[in-house]
Amino acid sequence: MDFKRVKEYFAWLYYQYQIITCCAVMEPWEQSMLNTIILTIVAMVVYTAYVFIPIHIRLAWEFFSKICGYDSSISN
């Protein structure tokens, strides 16, 4: 894979981010505030998914295994 193309792709993604969030027309302190808020939201979503998705998968597995007639469940 060509590293120049990868660099150009990330530059394009960053440009798209600036256009979508209107960061291109903001002052630097406004950009940093918006970036902090977005980073906080993304971090919270990733953490919540990391914590709660395995629990829901286990509960769904137990629910459907009881419906299908399997008596064994995942041991804790």
Curated annotation (Swiss-Prot):
Q: Which cysteines are joined by disulfide bonds?
A: none
**What triggers or suppresses the expression of this protein?**
While expression is androgen independent in the hpg mouse prostate, it appears to be androgen-dependent in the kidney and brain of normal intact mouse suggesting tissue specific regulation by androgens.
Q: Provide the membrane-side ranges marked Lumenal in the record.
A: 30-36
- GO annotations of cellular component type: endoplasmic reticulum membrane; serine palmitoyltransferase complex
GO annotation (BP), single: ceramide biosynthetic process
Hey, which pathway is this one from? Lipid metabolism; sphingolipid metabolism
Q: Cytoplasmic side: which ranges?
A: 1-11, 58-76
State the annotated membrane topology for this chain.
Multi-pass membrane protein
For this UniProt entry, the molecular function terms from Gene Ontology, in alphabetical order, are: serine C-palmitoyltransferase activity
Regarding tissue, the record states:
Expression is strong in hypogonadal (hpg) mouse prostate, weak in mature castrated mouse prostate and absent in normal intact or androgen-replaced hpg mouse prostates.
**TM ranges:** 12-29, 37-57
Keywords of the record:
Endoplasmic reticulum, Lipid metabolism, Membrane, Sphingolipid metabolism, Transmembrane, Transmembrane helix
Which locations, inside or outside the cell, does it occupy? Answer: Endoplasmic reticulum membrane
Subunit description: Component of the serine palmitoyltransferase (SPT) complex, which is composed of SPTLC1, SPTLC2 or SPTLC3 and SPTSSA or SPTSSB. The heterodimer consisting of SPTLC1 and SPTLC2/SPTLC3 forms the catalytic core of the enzyme, while SPTSSA or SPTSSB subunits determine substrate specificity. SPT also interacts with ORMDL proteins, especially ORMDL3, which negatively regulate SPT activity in the presence of ceramides.
Tell me which family the UniProt entry assigns to this protein.
Belongs to the SPTSS family. SPTSSB subfamily.
**PANTHER family assigned to the protein according to its UniProt record, in alphabetical order:** SERINE PALMITOYLTRANSFERASE SMALL SUBUNIT B
Q: What does this protein do?
A: Component of the serine palmitoyltransferase multisubunit enzyme (SPT) that catalyzes the initial and rate-limiting step in sphingolipid biosynthesis by condensing L-serine and activated acyl-CoA (most commonly palmitoyl-CoA) to form long-chain bases. The SPT complex is composed of SPTLC1, SPTLC2 or SPTLC3 and SPTSSA or SPTSSB. Within this complex, the heterodimer consisting of SPTLC1 and SPTLC2/SPTLC3 forms the catalytic core. Within the SPT complex, SPTSSB stimulates the catalytic activity and plays a role in substrate specificity.
What protein name is recorded for this chain? Answer: Serine palmitoyltransferase small subunit B
Q: Which organism is it from?
A: Mus musculus
